A protein has these predicted regions:
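Hydrophobic, well-ordered secondary-structure elements that form the walls
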Residues: 85
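A generic short-segment signal for beta-strand/edge and adjacent turn/coil regions
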Residues: 53-56, 122
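Short, solvent-exposed loop/edge segments of extracellular or virion-exposed proteins
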Residues: 166-175
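Alpha-helix N-cap and loop-to-helix initiation/capping positions
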Residues: 8, 12, 58-65
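Glycoside hydrolase catalytic-domain groove-lining segments
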Residues: 1-54, 71-82
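Aromatic-rich peripheral "rim/lid" segments of glycoside hydrolase catalytic domains that contact
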Residues: 40-48, 60-68, 88-166
């Protein structure tokens, strides 16, 4: 796994991947990565990446920053001779609205990490943190299931794309 908001810079990821390759002779796959497209919470269950004080420098909580982050991770992985990158978890959207009591929906249909039944086999992790989706603001679909424009980044990585330069966000400056 490589989550830039938890695991450091792309350069750090490259160094780790190269070190694994050099020491073990094994190539690396990045089996999980993601980034938020919003700081909103879609189901009332706290998000793992809030999209506020925990953002990566140079990236906002926007659809464009989500796409740019994915592109930058893939480019850095390619430079480090990483075999590939999987996005986690692009379809993890809420099962009910933020304002609803989602507990019954989470138990019946599942959502997020686990249901309460997981306490039987994983009491210290999933058994404590079951319920809604902590990843809904990092999906590649909005809270109602419509695809985000950032989903196109995978097509652009394969086939290329050109676009006019545009400002995604302007960071606040304090003096």
């Amino acid at each position: 796994s490589y989550y830039p908001f938890w695991d450091g810079t792309n350069e750090n990821m490259q160094n780790v991947a190269r070190n694994i390759d050099e020491k073990s002779g094994k190539k690396v796959y990045i089996a999980e990565t993601s980034y938020c497209y919003t700081s909103e919470d879609g189901d009332g269950f706290d998000n793992s990446l809030k999209g506020t004080d925990d953002l990566v420098d140079g990236y906002a909580a926007t659809v464009q920053s989500q796409a740019t982050m994915i592109r930058d991770i893939c480019a850095a992985a390619n430079e480090a001779d990483v075999l590939g990158v999987f996005y986690w978890e692009g379809t993890w959207i809420p099962v009910g609205e933020k304002t609803a009591d989602n507990s019954a929906l989470w138990e019946k249909y599942g959502s997020g990490w686990a249901s309460s039944y997981s306490a039987d086999y994983d009491p210290d992790d999933a058994g404590l943190y079951y319920g809604g989706c902590s990843w809904d603001n990092q999906a590649m679909f909005d809270f109602t299931g419509h695809p985000l424009a950032s989903l196109n980044v995978f097509k652009y990585l394969k086939y290329g794309a050109t676009a006019p330069l545009a400002v995604d966000f302007i960071p606040e400056v304090s003096v």
